UniProtKB/Swiss-Prot annotation:
Changing S187A: Fails to translocate from nucleoli to the nuclear plasma. Residues 363-380 have a biased composition (Basic residues). Signal peptide: none annotated. Changing D181A: Loss of flap endonuclease activity but substrate binding activity is retained. Changing D179A: No effect on flap endonuclease activity or substrate binding. Structure-specific nuclease with 5'-flap endonuclease and 5'-3' exonuclease activities involved in DNA replication and repair. During DNA replication, cleaves the 5'-overhanging flap structure that is generated by displacement synthesis when DNA polymerase encounters the 5'-end of a downstream Okazaki fragment. It enters the flap from the 5'-end and then tracks to cleave the flap base, leaving a nick for ligation. Also involved in the long patch base excision repair (LP-BER) pathway, by cleaving within the apurinic/apyrimidinic (AP) site-terminated flap. One of its GO terms (molecular function) is endonuclease activity. Gene3D superfamilies: 5' to 3' exonuclease, C-terminal subdomain (1.10.150.20), 5'-nuclease (3.40.50.1010). Binds 2 magnesium ions per subunit. They probably participate in the reaction catalyzed by the enzyme. May bind an additional third magnesium ion after substrate binding. This is Flap endonuclease 1. It comes from Homo sapiens.
Length: 380
């Protein structure tokens, strides 16, 4: 879910914090991508006649086709992607995960009813609601990435939190995900729609945290409290407080504690056993990989092993996969050129958003497990 309504709120009250770019604008940029979010998009979008792609054994292959071709497209445009996979979800997320299970069970019932009624559009809608990224999907995508020479990392917990840590450390330019809570975790730059389908023709949206805070007149801790009021994955929000009201309250009272003291409890009842303090702490001090322990490396694709996996096991067209590998190899030769703004510091524009910010005190960092294409060095 991320943060409810945050993207629209920023567009309404801090529009200068957003800019839209074509994918070509990111030539030479390293980007940390929320892998689970991307795989979910591929499972939803890469379909044939409304159904996911499958091989003869009935195994789903939509995620592999999506990962293969979208990654090649990024590389062809000079982007150097590193995929970050989710680790163990924080305990605070258990309530949200339980709600998702309930919604899936309800969607399953509605799907059966739609199938019985022969309502094709309803069947497609509820089928997509049942899409879930599994361990097998993740493992197969990791294997594919390693054969493509693309680095990936295993986060100890939430992928978007570790993506944010990589941006703050200057290891990558931006975090790419549809989950807006990447900003709540402190990512200086967030990119949306990077892995969206080309057919949708969505421009890439770039959100700059420093400009958001400046426009709202908030610091990061106050912004975190605003996000909690809007609604997050980690605790309930106060019913009856909409986005604009939440902004007004935070700007006036500066913290959730002070807001609660001044609210009419009959009109705005606070959730029972409200875990807003724990959620606040989680956003400011998440369990993340240690960016200094990570050395990112993009290497030459292993063509024959890719053919063995994608064509032999997953039954994709050999001609198409070999063509994709050629495109990938060619893109590597062109992406070695750097960006001019990596050498010259430009000030006073969105593109000069801070590349590095200090970690909050007590931030829990762990060394991430790394794929074959990503190597470790000792932390500084």
């Amino acid at each position: 879910m991320g943060i409810q309504g945050l993207a629209k709120l920023i567009a309404d009250v801090a529009p200068s914090a957003i800019r839209e770019n074509d994918i070509k604008s990111y030539f030479g940029r390293k980007v940390a991508i929320d892998a689970s979010m991307s795989i979910y998009q591929f499972l939803i979008a890469v379909r044939q006649g409304g159904d996911v792609l499958q091989n003869e054994e009935g195994e789903t292959t939509s995620h592999l086709m999506g990962m293969f071709y979208r990654t090649i497209r990024m590389m062809e445009n000079g982007i150097k992607p590193v995929y970050v996979f989710d680790g163990k979800p924080p305990q605070l997320k258990s309530g949200e995960l339980a709600k998702r299970s309930e919604r899936r069970a309800e969607a399953e019932k509605q799907l059966q009813q739609a199938q019985a009624a022969g309502a094709e559009q309803e069947v497609e809608k509820f089928t997509k609601r049942l899409v879930k990224v599994t361990k097998q999907h993740n493992d197969e995508c990791k294997h594919l990435l390693s054969l493509m020479g693309i680095p990936y990392l295993d986060a100890p917990s939430e992928a978007e939190a570790s993506c944010a840590a990589l941006v703050k450390a200057g290891k990558v330019y931006a975090a790419a995900t549809e989950d807006m809570d990447c900003l709540t975790f402190g990512s200086p730059v967030l990119m949306r729609h990077l892995t969206a389908s080309e057919a949708k023709k969505l421009p890439i949206q770039e959100f700059h945290l420093s400009r958001i805070l400046q426009e709202l007149g908030l610091n990061q801790e106050q912004f975190v409290d605003l996000c909690i009021l809007l609604g997050s994955d980690y605790c309930e929000s106060i019913r009856g407080i909409g986005p604009k009201r939440a902004v007004d309250l935070i700007q006036k009272h500066k913290s959730i504690e002070e807001i609660v003291r001044r609210l009419d409890p009959n009109k705005y009842p606070v959730p029972e056993n409200w875990l807003h303090k724990e959620a606040h702490q989680l956003f400011l001090e998440p369990e993340v990989l240690d960016p200094e322990s990570v050395e990112l490396k993009w290497s030459e694709p292993n063509e024959e092993e890719l053919i063995k996996f994608m064509c032999g096991e997953k039954q994709f067209s050999e001609e198409r996969i070999r063509s994709g590998v050629k495109r990938l190899s060619k893109s590597r030769q062109g992406s070695t050129q750097g960006r001019l703004d990596d050498f010259f510091k430009v000030t006073g524009s969105l593109s000069s958003a801070k590349r590095k910010e200090p970690e909050p005190k007590g931030s829990t960092k762990k060394k991430a497990k790394t794929g074959a294409a990503g190597k470790f060095k000792r932390g500084k």
